[in-house]
């Protein structure tokens, strides 16, 4: 994801050897799902589900975990979801843009798919708060077994680790990022080694690979069969990261890392924990740490903490990356994006997101105090995002790839059925703590839809009093104003209408520049726009030009740099001859039909606090003039 991914991948990604790419992918992509053994079986047998720690219960749960990993990750994500890349980019926003394109002119379907994408993105932010909290808490809880009386110190220690993690984000993790891969490879080797040790105690645990144990479990526990999926799904947390980080590593390195190292290590560890439980049911209080020899407990706690910090770093960086994509697709107000590396464009930091996540994580740790309590909140965010991803991929498979329905529909129905069951199993958890990601998701969904709709209404209101460009130019020919030297660039959302800033400037100053450029920035539903397709230029005469700049949702919108590509003899964009005119709209909530008054007030607040065009488009501060306009909505 974003920052962490590029730290591990580096600029030499395309030339890296397969083993190097595999190690890098393990360090970034698999941190979240790789730390799931810390708490999954612990939650299953201590989460109040009523599962007995006996032979049939243990084998039934292991069968559910094993076949969930096979179906959801090995089949659904590896074979289908990872193929749905948007010019190599993955993630819920990239997939939303791809699905929106697949829907074509079907407006209702487009709207439905966008809503699904925004729901998935909103839940991802909830996941971005829960993952660091539950991961670090579960790692530090190992100290309870190593030292008596340390229970009261678990929360403070976890908070210190988490706060330190958020504090270093602004400075980047370029140097330590190179250690992510080796540390996580070590982690998975330790997982596998501990698992082998446990399996040797009770080799019969391997029979849980037979799916009939899962069937027997449902038959023996008809009342809790579906509910237990709410705990089993914890083994799948982080599956979405496989898709989100595809743009940095590609599908093949991610798949190789999964099948060669990650899947075997996870299966061995889960089965090793299960084997230990067959011999010692009391170990269910913390099966991961009790699987290790007593002499290895402290080193294992240290390694677990490092692994959970790396997993948390990947999620935080993913939130930064997702936010940048959402900003450029028009779903989130512009924020200040800081680059933490001069070498890697993808290493970014967004302060508003970082501090919001930190506050959310601190509240979660203080409110829930243990990984077991947090587990109830975790599943809702994970399964909700997975379900939205499946819906979006379904649209891409049927409408964009044109897969024959006779082949695609059975696969998609199975995927939707499994995801739906996992999501349904987590719905009852909403009243047990799962309300947090749901409420966070609702708030973020309202913010994103309000911003998108508000911007649309704002453009419509500005257009109501707009003057068509041809009429304006004709009037200039009849009554030419005084012209001054230089180039004036007016940013406008509508390239065929006269910007309000231009009208205000002419009205108050009674002059026009020699060259007047009406500049429109358009964001496409693709990650990157080639330099050859970056701009369109039209000359209207009388020194007027229309320029349209095209950017992808991962491109860096550097307007002065992009304008240098406009090779037109009549245009001069030299820095000391170019002035940029911006319009700053102030929205006033009114009774005009559009949005509810409270949403209009919310949009006005968001617009007031959004980052302006000056910083976002990297305009030179000393060459910008900003003019204000009041708009009633």
Curated annotation (Swiss-Prot):
Single GO term (MF): symporter activity
Keyword Cell inner membrane in record: yes
Principal location class: membrane
Catalytically driven reaction(s): K(+)(in) + H(+)(in) = K(+)(out) + H(+)(out)
Keyword line: Cell inner membrane, Cell membrane, Ion transport, Membrane, Potassium, Potassium transport, Symport, Transmembrane, Transmembrane helix, Transport
Annotated localization: Cell inner membrane
Domain of life the protein comes from: Bacteria
Cystine pairs: none
Cellular component GO terms, alphabetical: plasma membrane
Annotated membrane topology: Multi-pass membrane protein
Keyword Membrane: yes
Parts of the chain that traverse the membrane: 19-39, 61-81, 112-132, 149-169, 179-199, 224-244, 258-278, 290-310, 348-368, 377-397, 398-418, 430-450
Pfam family, one: K_trans
InterPro entries linked to this entry: K+_transporter, K_trans_C, K_trans_N, Kup
Task performed by this protein: Transport of potassium into the cell. Likely operates as a K(+):H(+) symporter.
Protein family: Belongs to the HAK/KUP transporter (TC 2.A.72) family.
Protein name: Probable potassium transport system protein Kup
This protein's encoding gene: kup
